[in-house]
């Protein structure tokens, strides 16, 4: 893929606009059907248990996570918990899934890690975090399935889901450092086969995390710690 400048890429993006037991945290109370087939959602979420046992460069081993999937309309399809993940990370995982879906299109994939630098003061997307606020009605555990909770998070852990080169939704992970959350989400999506034919801002043409050596610029993300890895 021929390298593109950050400004050119942004123009494209904005134009299109056991201890390892998995617990389902939804009761199906919503009235909007998920636009992703149930089998596909299940295939994504089933990857969490295996990925959590890998070295993901985070604070916990095995990982303790919330994992959320939204469809292209932002409808919450599924949110699950692995281990004693931080309760506050439930809403964050949903918001990450929403962000990755909301700001990716068929021309350009942007993970939430890619959005870190552009949304800092002076960045071309500064203020984005004030858009699409999370609906507090869905903060409670067990709520939000079949609804559109919204939310914007611009640090690692959210990736768009692609099928045949088209965005079908987003996946959000939260429960560790933002860098580890990204690794887990990225690996889950790859194992589920929903990372095909996407076009991203990383040098390899993906939406992988781009670590900054100094102050993050372009589509970079700061390091979270000495154990950080690139999946």
Regions found by a protein language model. Name each.
Residues 1-9:
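Bacterial N-terminal signal peptides that target proteins for export
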Residues 13-14:
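Long, compositionally biased tandem-repeat segments
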Residues 24-231:
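Flexible, solvent-exposed loop/hinge segments and secondary-structure transition points
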């Amino acid at each position: 893929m021929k390298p593109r400048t950050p400004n050119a890429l942004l123009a494209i993006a904005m134009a299109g606009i056991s201890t390892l037991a998995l617990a389902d945290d939804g009761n199906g109370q919503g009235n909007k059907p998920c636009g992703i087939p149930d089998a596909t959602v299940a295939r994504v979420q089933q990857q969490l248990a295996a990925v959590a046992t890998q070295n993901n460069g985070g604070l916990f081993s095995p990982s303790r996570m919330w994992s959320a999937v939204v469809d292209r309309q932002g409808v919450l399809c599924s949110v699950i918990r692995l281990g004693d993940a931080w309760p506050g990370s439930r809403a964050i995982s949903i918001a990450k899934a929403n962000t990755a879906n909301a700001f990716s299109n068929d021309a350009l994939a942007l993970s939430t890690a890619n959005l870190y630098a552009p949304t800092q003061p002076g960045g071309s997307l500064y203020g984005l975090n004030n858009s699409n606020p999370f609906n507090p009605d869905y903060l409670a555990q067990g709520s939000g399935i079949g609804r559109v909770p919204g939310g914007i998070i611009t640090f690692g852990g959210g990736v768009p889901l692609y099928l045949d080169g088209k965005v079908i939704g987003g996946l959000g992970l939260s429960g560790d450092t933002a860098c580890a959350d990204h690794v887990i989400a990225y690996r889950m999506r790859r194992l589920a086969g929903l990372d095909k034919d996407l076009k991203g801002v990383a040098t390899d043409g993906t939406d992988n995390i781009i670590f900054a050596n100094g102050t993050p610029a372009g589509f970079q993300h700061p390091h979270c710690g000495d154990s950080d890895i690139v999946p």
